[in-house]
Amino acid sequence: MLGDLFTKPKKRKYATIPSDGTKADVPEGIMTKCPECKKIMYTKELQKNLMVCNYCGFHHPIGAKARIDMLVDEGSFEEIDANLTTANPLGFEDYMDRIEKDKQKSGLNEAILTGHATIGGNPLVIAVMDSRFRMASMGSVVGEKILRAVEDADKTNKPFVIFTASGGARMQEGMLSLMQMAKTSAAFKRFSNHGGLVITVMTHPTTGGVSASFASLGDYNFAEPGALIGFAGRRVIEQTVREELPEDFQTAEFLLKHGQLDDCISRLDLQNKLSFILSIHVKTPEVGGEADGE
């Protein structure tokens, strides 16, 4: 009995049974797991639902081209300023290598896609930011493309609609990126002074210099449900004000509740909503005066 206490236990032997190869081979990308409710669904079904979760309504991120395809009238989109590409004015190390990788990943030359289109037959100039490209940070080219798009809307007498999704100003361009905040805001103001209509739709995430400049300067300011919208990060604010912030702080729903948004609109309803707003703001030619030769 006592001897058993000092006896080494015998090691259990295990045998590895080879797989018979009958395990189902699931192609990559065929299923998508919702990060919010953790439910798994077919990717094709998710795409049919405009990348909105069928179970909880979570809005999955989408690229600029996909958003335009699901929003504007088929075949109506005509891109503008596609030739504008980023330089490296500060000589930031490996910046251009990162830009090239993002070009391949997103299929875009920059973090924003701009052009003319129609929604429900209503003409507009549209701009869509793409978070796959440098987290849609605003550098000199992004600012320039927004400026030119707004000026195009002004010249052609069309409304301007912009979808924002950004991590803020692009640090690799330093002061040049910060200048875009004033540049874009001034363009919005000039357009507004000329009677132009601006609609902003903030998507997840809209933060930093973009949220602090043009993102909230629309005549209508909308957001997708659950979008993170704010300037500084939650922890930075808590450490500054020395207070615990509400759980839903910096969400689209929180901003709507406190009067900083006009509406929080599901992606599934956005096309109809925009079509209606654009239709009631159509500018008609003035009757009489010089137009009639008087």
UniProtKB/Swiss-Prot annotation:
Zn(2+) binds at C34, C37, C53, C56. GO terms for molecular function: acetyl-CoA carboxylase activity; ATP binding; carboxyl- or carbamoyltransferase activity; zinc ion binding. It is found in: Cytoplasm. It is an enzyme of class 2 (transferase). The keyword Mitochondrion does not apply. One of its GO terms (biological process) is malonyl-CoA biosynthetic process. A zinc finger (C4-type) spans 34-56. GO terms for cellular component: acetyl-CoA carboxylase complex. Its cofactor is Zn(2+). It comes from the Bacteria. Pathway: Lipid metabolism; malonyl-CoA biosynthesis; malonyl-CoA from acetyl-CoA: step 1/1. Keywords: ATP-binding, Cytoplasm, Fatty acid biosynthesis, Fatty acid metabolism, Lipid biosynthesis, Lipid metabolism, Metal-binding, Nucleotide-binding, Transferase, Zinc, Zinc-finger. PROSITE patterns: COA_CT_NTER. The keyword Cell inner membrane does not apply. It catalyses: N(6)-carboxybiotinyl-L-lysyl-[protein] + acetyl-CoA = N(6)-biotinyl-L-lysyl-[protein] + malonyl-CoA. Its EC number is 2.1.3.15. Binds 1 zinc ion per subunit. Residues 30-294 form the CoA carboxyltransferase N-terminal domain. Its main location: cytoplasm. Acetyl-CoA carboxylase is a heterohexamer composed of biotin carboxyl carrier protein (AccB), biotin carboxylase (AccC) and two subunits each of ACCase subunit alpha (AccA) and ACCase subunit beta (AccD). Component of the acetyl coenzyme A carboxylase (ACC) complex. Biotin carboxylase (BC) catalyzes the carboxylation of biotin on its carrier protein (BCCP) and then the CO(2) group is transferred by the transcarboxylase to acetyl-CoA to form malonyl-CoA. Belongs to the AccD/PCCB family. This is Acetyl-coenzyme A carboxylase carboxyl transferase subunit beta. The gene is accD.
